[in-house]
């Protein structure tokens, strides 16, 4: 499988080349669409085998809201890193600076495919500001505004 196809999709190998996250906190499975400095769409296939379902909640498994936000933040990271990947070094990391206006509209459960749609609102003084939405079967599950910055470590 190739890293990229004609629509800007990226497979898991390409994702792991850009994001430092690994199991159990790598929360993106595939990038579906990418427009540099504008938009990225990706998915997380949610399965009952996720480690967080052991305790959240055993009788009615629901993906924790904080992990939904983390998956959206990782999609924002992919958008930023894919947009500037020609200028990145191996020591560059994207740090989460803040999350505002977070709202949860429906639970995300095993068997769901969580779709991330993230867009750049603006980049100001090194801070990327994104609009982020997560949906399942076209129904809004969560939305927020995410701020990130690239730093060399």
From Swiss-Prot:
The active site is at residue 56. InterPro entries: FabA_FabZ, FabZ, HotDog_dom_sf. It holds the Pfam family FabA. Its main location: cytoplasm. Keywords: Cytoplasm, Lipid A biosynthesis, Lipid biosynthesis, Lipid metabolism, Lyase. GO terms for cellular component: cytoplasm; membrane. It comes from the Bacteria. It catalyses: a (3R)-hydroxyacyl-[ACP] = a (2E)-enoyl-[ACP] + H2O. The keyword Iron does not apply. Signal peptide: none annotated. The keyword Transmembrane helix does not apply. GO terms for molecular function: (3R)-hydroxyacyl-[acyl-carrier-protein] dehydratase activity. GO terms for biological process: fatty acid biosynthetic process; lipid A biosynthetic process. It is found in: Cytoplasm. Its EC number is 4.2.1.59. Involved in unsaturated fatty acids biosynthesis. Catalyzes the dehydration of short chain beta-hydroxyacyl-ACPs and long chain saturated and unsaturated beta-hydroxyacyl-ACPs. Belongs to the thioester dehydratase family. FabZ subfamily. This is 3-hydroxyacyl-[acyl-carrier-protein] dehydratase FabZ. The gene is fabZ.
């Amino acid at each position: 499988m190739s890293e990229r196809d004609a629509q800007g999709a990226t497979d898991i190998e390409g994702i792991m080349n850009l994001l430092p996250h690994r199991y159990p906190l790598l929360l993106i499975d595939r990038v579906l669409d990418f427009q540099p400095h504008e938009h990225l769409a990706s998915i997380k296939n949610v399965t009952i085998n996720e480690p967080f379902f052991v305790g959240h909640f055993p009788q009615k498994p629901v993906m924790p809201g904080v992990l939904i936000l983390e998956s959206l933040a990782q999609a924002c990271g992919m958008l930023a890193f894919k947009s500037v990947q020609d200028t990145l070094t191996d020591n560059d990391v994207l740090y989460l600076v803040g999350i505002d206006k977070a709202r949860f509209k429906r639970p995300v459960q095993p068997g769901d495919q969580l779709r991330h749609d993230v867009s750049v609102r603006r980049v100001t003084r090194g801070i990327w500001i994104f609009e982020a939405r997560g949906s399942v079967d076209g129904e809004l599950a969560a939305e927020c505004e995410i701020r990130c910055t690239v730093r060399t470590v």
